[in-house]
């Protein structure tokens, strides 16, 4: 009798995706982050659902409702901090997942990559709106500053901002709609993630060498199921260490003060995972220019397939581009640091130099190094 998992319409889909899926035998731990992101998303949806049961999206009661969750709800503090720090884990996995894709040339799977870029934008939008919900000082002023950037759009800017606000400032209407969008977006992200997987399974996984691995495939289960479970356990260990011992380490103390439109915090800054983009935004003195640079800093990922000049896919055998890649990583860390610093003398110029080098490495130096490496390998006649 044929196995039910191979014949049943529903089980068949699961079987072809997670059990009998042929996978390259040499993929490293850098390929674990896809499954970790799936787990992160599930944790965020579940904890978020329980938080939504007790949260009220009204300017008068939002801050109090979050306090109520932490003090009065059974394990409310645990749910709240798992959700807040879960977002940080989500972004750590996301950045490592994208970094892996850049290093090993996974962006040559165009459809998968573009859905991935779309997912990145969706997750960033969700995280931004989620940060506004506790209605602390940094929530309010972060929302004000970031939404205000849209006013830089010529002609329709001001009208657009007032339309998003639902009034003439960030107020009750803004908070309510942000809660609505923050609730619905994770489900859209889940749907996009399924499409992401669908496109990936059309081509099969890439591998560290960047070479065709059709001759050497192994089944996903048990080899990669057990490997993924190990990754998940390690991630939960890190997450729960954060949640139980350092729950506020990645947060901002200003957000423990209720939102006050009459009092601006000394340094308005977003959560740590947006600091690199915030630094790029601030490094350009012109408002519209800054907004364009901010969007381009993420959208540049969509250009990666067109900037690939080498005849080799992966950076595994490309030492010059490898050096540039790690300089880019260091550069992003510098941008993250600068984003959290005040707008003062040494930081302004460091931020501007880091922003210039960020775009230069991706748009100019990496494509050139690809051509040079091909010449060195005499791949061109």
Curated annotation (Swiss-Prot):
Heme b b566 binds at residues 97, 196. One of its GO terms (molecular function) is metal ion binding. It is found in: Mitochondrion inner membrane. Binds 2 heme b groups non-covalently. GO terms for biological process: mitochondrial electron transport, ubiquinol to cytochrome c. A ubiquinone binds at residue 201. It is a multi-pass membrane protein. PROSITE patterns: CYTB_CTER (PS51003), CYTB_NTER (PS51002). Keywords: Electron transport, Heme, Iron, Membrane, Metal-binding, Mitochondrion, Mitochondrion inner membrane, Respiratory chain, Transmembrane, Transmembrane helix, Transport, Ubiquinone. Heme b b562 binds at residues 83, 182. Its cofactor is heme b. The chain crosses the membrane at residues 33-53, 77-98, 113-133, 178-198, 226-246, 288-308, 320-340, 347-367. One of its GO terms (cellular component) is respiratory chain complex III. The cytochrome bc1 complex contains 11 subunits: 3 respiratory subunits (MT-CYB, CYC1 and UQCRFS1), 2 core proteins (UQCRC1 and UQCRC2) and 6 low-molecular weight proteins (UQCRH/QCR6, UQCRB/QCR7, UQCRQ/QCR8, UQCR10/QCR9, UQCR11/QCR10 and a cleavage product of UQCRFS1). This cytochrome bc1 complex then forms a dimer. Heme 1 (or BL or b562) is low-potential and absorbs at about 562 nm, and heme 2 (or BH or b566) is high-potential and absorbs at about 566 nm. Belongs to the cytochrome b family. Component of the ubiquinol-cytochrome c reductase complex (complex III or cytochrome b-c1 complex) that is part of the mitochondrial respiratory chain. The b-c1 complex mediates electron transfer from ubiquinol to cytochrome c. Contributes to the generation of a proton gradient across the mitochondrial membrane that is then used for ATP synthesis. This is Cytochrome b. It comes from Mus poschiavinus (Tobacco mouse). The lineage of its organism: Eukaryota, Metazoa, Chordata, Craniata, Vertebrata.
